[in-house]
Amino acid sequence: MFSNYRQYWDLTKPKVVALIVFTALVGMVLAIPGVPSWEQVRAGVLGFLGIWLAASAAAAINQLLDAHIDAQMARTSWRPLVVGKVKPWQVLVFASVLIVLSMVILVLWVNLITAVLTFASLIGYAVIYTVYLKRATSQNIVIGGLAGAMPPMLGWAAVTGMQGSSDWAYSSLLVLIIFIWTPPHFWALAIFRREDYAKAEIPMLPVTHGVVHTRKQIMVYSVVLALVCLLPYLVGMSGAFYLGGAIVLNAVFLWYAWRMLDPPDELFSMKMFYYSIVYLMALFAFLLVDHWILPWL
């Protein structure tokens, strides 16, 4: 049944999932004041595993449903299903096993709310976004981005069970940051790959509204993102260390967005795309250090 294990590893989009589970991990840490109890550590480890399995399953389902699109795009034409290294039924079985394992772990050994939120996120990305939104509207990334923004809340839920309104409020701030970050992140890539998207008949914003309009939207979202990133500090969720890091990271992000309005070359949008990945990792790392590590130094 199974081909080279590497093909199945590639089906999970490991680099993308790594960023997803990192933000979930930060959500877990931020949810716990002080030193975590053994029960919180246990729930965190199992929650991390369950979220990782679900995210991997969603990535595999996405490749299964998008195989005909991936075949038309240079960026994705190498994927295992496209080149025939795995068969559709193998991907379906693989993803199903991951989903079952994820739900068993989350329901039996973490808590029900984490399982429900995780499953809803999986369906939101793998089905609602992939099957409908991606093909239906130029706002696909904006609307569908909510599913991809959920991991910090999933991590938060794993160690708290979302018992109070503050759990929902604080974890929602983390979700909001990723939700606002998602459009400029993907639109920068879409500008560079717009011919691929047009060929595959995917209505990404640069295809439907043009590059100039997309660059302006990137600028708008970047300004909103910079403002939203102040909220964890303003509500007392994080301290000065995070604030300083967020200001620097957003200053660079805004510079990229401003430069995108009149880029020096065609490759500049990819430079912003790659920086946006570093940006999100660093921003959540600042949240992590500020909340937990810094007080112990």
Curated annotation (Swiss-Prot):
It is an enzyme of class 2 (transferase). The keyword Amino-acid biosynthesis does not apply. It catalyses: heme b + (2E,6E)-farnesyl diphosphate + H2O = Fe(II)-heme o + diphosphate. InterPro entries: Protohaem_IX_farnesylTrfase, UbiA_prenyltransferase, UbiA_prenylTrfase_CS, UbiA_sf. GO terms for cellular component: plasma membrane. It is found in: Cell inner membrane. The chain crosses the membrane at residues 16-36, 45-65, 93-113, 114-134, 141-161, 172-192, 223-243, 244-264, 277-297. It is a multi-pass membrane protein. Keywords: Cell inner membrane, Cell membrane, Heme biosynthesis, Membrane, Transferase, Transmembrane, Transmembrane helix. Pathway: Porphyrin-containing compound metabolism; heme O biosynthesis; heme O from protoheme: step 1/1. Its EC number is 2.5.1.141. The keyword Cell division does not apply. GO terms for molecular function: protoheme IX farnesyltransferase activity. One of its GO terms (biological process) is heme O biosynthetic process. Its main location: membrane. It comes from the Bacteria. Converts heme B (protoheme IX) to heme O by substitution of the vinyl group on carbon 2 of heme B porphyrin ring with a hydroxyethyl farnesyl side group. Belongs to the UbiA prenyltransferase family. Protoheme IX farnesyltransferase subfamily. Carbon 2 of the heme B porphyrin ring is defined according to the Fischer nomenclature. This is Protoheme IX farnesyltransferase. It comes from Stenotrophomonas maltophilia (strain R551-3). The gene is cyoE.
